[in-house]
Amino acid sequence: VELGQVEIIASRSSVKTDAEGTTYRISMQGLPPKAKAVLALKRLPGVITRMEVFSLIGARGSATIYVDEVPVDPKFLSTLEAADIDRVEVRYMDHNSSGEGGAIYIYRKKAEHPVLKGDLDLSGGLLRPSWRLTPSLTLYSRAVDIIANASATYSHQSPEFHIYRNDHPELSIYNRAKVLQTGGQVFATAELTPRLRGTLTYAHFGLQSWHNSQVKQQGMVTSGKIRENQMRHAVNLLLAYKLGSNNRLLLKSYGSWMLGNDTDLRGMVDRINSRDVLAEIAYEHNEASLLGLTHRLGVGFGGRLGRNSLYDGFAPYRNRQLRAYVRDNVSLLEDLSLYFILTGQWGEYGRDRLYSYSTFTPSLSLSYELGGYTIGLRYGHSVQHPSADLLSPRVFYRNELEQRQGNPHLGPQYTDNWALSLSKQFGRHSLSLKSTYWHASDLITSVYTNQPNVLTYGNAGIGDELSTTLNYSTALLSNQLSLNLYVGATYADYRLAPSYRARALSYGTRGWSLEWGGSVNYYHPKGWLANLDLSADGLSRSLSHQQEEEPQLMLLLQKSFFAGKLDVSIEVSAPFGWGERMTETTFLPGIIQRKEIRISQSNVSLGLTYHFGGEAKRPMKALTTSPLSLDDVKRSDL
């Protein structure tokens, strides 16, 4: 299907639909020659952009981003060029990703001749002191590809917090902060043999902040300094060995290490030392014949070890898990596709006492093509185990009215998710409608039990959410104008579990909320680019709170000079302070608590980006160890 800005492609020309996901090839027409992947993904139907965070229509949470099947930080998309992308797969169900946000898989092209190129990006704030420096370098060759970047961001911020109880001011916090964020990523891919390909990634993230804080409560003023330090390292390794033209063996490993410490106004220091290691082996067969049908099969087995020390005087949190899965994608008919995942997990977690578990979580997706419409039905069951900070019995101090205490006896949370979708492509337009029902039992949530100043955690709730989202995308003016818009409504009902009704102060929340927004891009061939991102998500609810945020807006205007070698840009974030405020309301017996938060986002930034390096001498081809090679991909008969 040709949509102008993207083209829907399929692995088998005889199949009209795929229950696993949709594969797109993105056109460079209407994009700047040096456009990055983050701009290209905004063209995909069913993909929602919220301030350069990508999510899928109707999904809970953000989508996990993969490049050549290795997970990357979304900021990596600002380094990868759109012209280097072969295709993009959008999957609402993914066996590699945790959570319920789905995944976006990006597969790169392979250069036949060496290419060395890069960028140097520098920007500074005009209204508030801030600057950002981001150099990047890309090397493509026959043997190895390397994409590397580094970043440093510095800003002055002035967040404020005000707490009211029954409309009476109780506490105010004023901060004057200096924040330094650093980061770097290296993405390396090597053709070790004609059949063996390896991909190694390393990422570093650092945060340092210095706060001069002032607290006003009941006529008393307390001043002091707060310091925050965080550092995280993450490594991914993927080895893919092609056994034949349609089957391969995968070895995946992941490791992360995080260190951090926070100092509060009392001089107390909270420290964390977290380590996580994962390894998995998988086998995939893309053309297996069984019962007269062609299957795309996959099986995998792996293990995970985690250790988290909070330095709170208690034993470290430990997590050990074995995981196995089987998945199958089969076309039952020319216009009917089935995809399912069955995952088994066995493990234990806890601090002094380890809790053992064994779970099986099925996921199922059906896709049916009827008269040009694609109808999808999905079901997923998942189990969520509590994290280390929720299990610590120590009281973590934020201020006199906001203290949090973990619960070492927390159990798992069980969720079920049903989704019904309808999509249609006509001309250069795409329309998608998706309705979802989400149910959670033994909900892991914050709850007030003994006093309104201390929030603890428990399997205290039952949650239900019913939502419907409509997405419309199109390309106009020879693809120069791109629109991707969404609007949705959600009814949420969070209520106390029977075991907590007699002893909890929280009431639960329920009601409707509306979300809308999208992305609009215009590119003129003479080098002008305009991009507008708008996100208005209205109310969000949990068992103890309801939260309302102002709409967020970001506007970018860019002009290219010297044959596209230099870009000059102006970026406007949260104009006139619109989007800086958030209100959190809590309902307790005899108390309505309202917390107003204002963060520092409003700014106008001037940026310069210098592009250097050459292009490939010949057209790029797809990487050979991807599940679908460029030679195997054919246009769908849709």
Feature locations, PLM:
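N-terminal periplasmic accessory domains that precede
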Residues: 1, 37-40, 55, 75, ...
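Short, acidic, small-residue-rich periplasmic hinge/interaction motif at the N-terminus
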Residues: 1-30, 51, 92-94, 101-103, ...
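Periplasmic plug
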Residues: 48-93
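Outer-membrane beta-barrel translocator/receptor signature
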Residues: 98-104, 112-160, 179-184
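Transmembrane beta-strands of outer-membrane beta-barrel pores
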Residues: 122-126, 141, 152-156, 202-208, ...
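Face-selective signature of the C-terminal outer-membrane beta-barrel domain
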Residues: 183-207, 226-369, 374-375, 430-437, ...
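Outer-membrane beta-barrel signature, preferentially recognizing the C-terminal barrel domain
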Residues: 373, 383-432, 437-441, 454-477, ...
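Gram-negative outer-membrane beta-barrel transporters
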Residues: 437-439, 458-540
